[in-house]
Structures are given as structure tokens and as C-alpha cells.
UniProtKB/Swiss-Prot annotation:
This is Outer-membrane lipoprotein carrier protein. One of its GO terms (biological process) is lipoprotein transport. Its main location: periplasm. Residues 1-21 form the signal peptide. Keywords: Chaperone, Periplasm, Protein transport, Signal, Transport. NCBIfam families: lolA (TIGR00547). Participates in the translocation of lipoproteins from the inner membrane to the outer membrane. Only forms a complex with a lipoprotein if the residue after the N-terminal Cys is not an aspartate (The Asp acts as a targeting signal to indicate that the lipoprotein should stay in the inner membrane).
Length: 207
């Protein structure tokens, strides 16, 4: 995948072992993701260029609910609000007094937030997945199977069965690290969290 008979036999053996390991990793990740039907947390997000220079640092709060609902609020001074009702996404920029509304892309490779809030039952169709565990932390590395993606690699880390952080790396090596704190799972969430009300006088862009 990515001449003698012995080499061929060795390659086939390795392939079978890798497929078995990957299958176990997929099942474990799916189980960890699906057990949280709702999630709320604070987050801190740090973006670095390929050379490690800091480009941006933000904080905020997220609220997620399966299937496909999320509210991602970034604090001032770079305030933004992204809300999904499961069908469309509204992105509100208060500085510009502008809201952009577009159809929710259900592909996990295009909308990473859906890894935490969407349908992940077929996650292995979109990613090659490997895992490693140490000290109560499980790291899952997801590599998209297609090139039409927002990122080249994504890492999800769980501590004691709860999402702890994630990292995205794009095609030019830019890294986005997101650390979650105060995580609460499976607590009731108001439906209004996922319903965006367009502010009076706002510019509306439909995509």
C-alpha cells in the first residue's frame, strides 16, 4: 500500500496486523466520542506557523450536542460566534456586524467540530486512525484518506476518557492546538444554544 516470496509473505503479515490494530483503534475512538452526547468546556487555542512562530492565541467556550449541533464562542478582542443547528452554520462577527450563513458540511474532514458533535459511526471511511496510550492519556492520530481536506493530520487526546485537547496540522505545517478545560459531558443543554438570532441591522451573507 504506502521480489522474492519471503518479502511478500512478510508484507502480507504486517498488513494483516496493521489492519487489526487500526480496527481496534477505530472502535475505541468511536466509543469514546459517542459516549458524550453533549459537551461543554472552555478552550484556549494557539496557532503556530511551520517554523513555530505564534500567529494567534484565543480563548472561548464551546457547547456541543449530537447530532451536529454546536456553539463555538471566541472571546474578545477577536470575538466570533459560530452556531450550527445541524443543517446550517451561522458565523457572527460583531466587529463587522456581519453574519455569514451556509449549509453545514457533514464531512468530518471539512468540519472538525463534527468529530465531537456529529455522526462518527463511519469515521474509518474518512480517516486512517492510530492510537497510543501512556499515563492515562490516549492520543489518536487521524490522517484523512482524501486530499480535499482542511488539514493533513489531526490528533485527539483523551484523559481518563474525556477529551483533553486536539491539534490540527495543515498542508504548510501550520499547527492549531486547542486545549479544553472544565469539560462537562452529558449534561442538559438549552436548545436555544444552537439557534442563532440575527442581530438587528446586521449584514447577512448567504453562501
Amino acid at each position: 500500500m504506502r521480489l522474492i516470496r519471503m518479502l511478500l509473505a512478510t508484507a502480507l503479515t504486517f498488513s494483516v496486523m496493521s489492519a487489526h490494530a487500526d480496527s481496534k483503534d477505530v472502535a475505541r475512538l468511536t466509543q469514546l466520542l459517542e459516549k458524550s452526547q453533549t459537551l461543554t468546556a472552555r478552550f484556549s487555542q494557539l496557532t503556530l506557523d511551520g517554523g513555530g512562530t505564534q500567529l494567534q492565541e484565543t480563548t472561548g467556550e464551546m457547547t456541543l450536542q449530537r447530532p451536529g449541533l454546536f456553539n463555538w464562542h471566541t472571546d474578545a478582542p477577536q470575538e466570533q460566534l459560530m452556531v450550527s443547528d445541524g443543517k446550517k452554520v451561522s458565523l457572527w462577527d460583531p466587529d463587522l456586524e456581519q453574519v455569514t450563513i451556509k449549509k453545514l458540511d457533514q464531512r468530518l474532514t471539512q468540519t472538525p467540530a463534527l468529530l465531537l458533535s456529529g455522526d462518527v459511526s463511519k469515521i474509518s471511511e474518512s480517516f486512517d486512525i492510530t492510537a497510543k496510550e501512556a499515563g492515562g492519556v490516549i492520543d489518536f492520530v487521524l490522517k484523512p484518506k482524501t486530499k480535499d481536506t482542511l488539514f493533513d493530520s489531526l490528533r485527539l487526546s483523551f484523559r481518563n476518557g474525556i477529551i483533553n485537547d486536539m491539534q490540527l496540522i495543515d498542508s504548510v505545517g501550520q499547527r492549531t492546538n486547542i486545549l479544553f478545560t472544565g469539560v462537562k459531558a452529558n449534561e442538559p443543554v438549552a436548545a436555544s444554544k444552537f439557534q442563532f438570532q440575527i442581530p438587528k441591522g446586521a449584514d447577512v451573507i448567504q453562501e
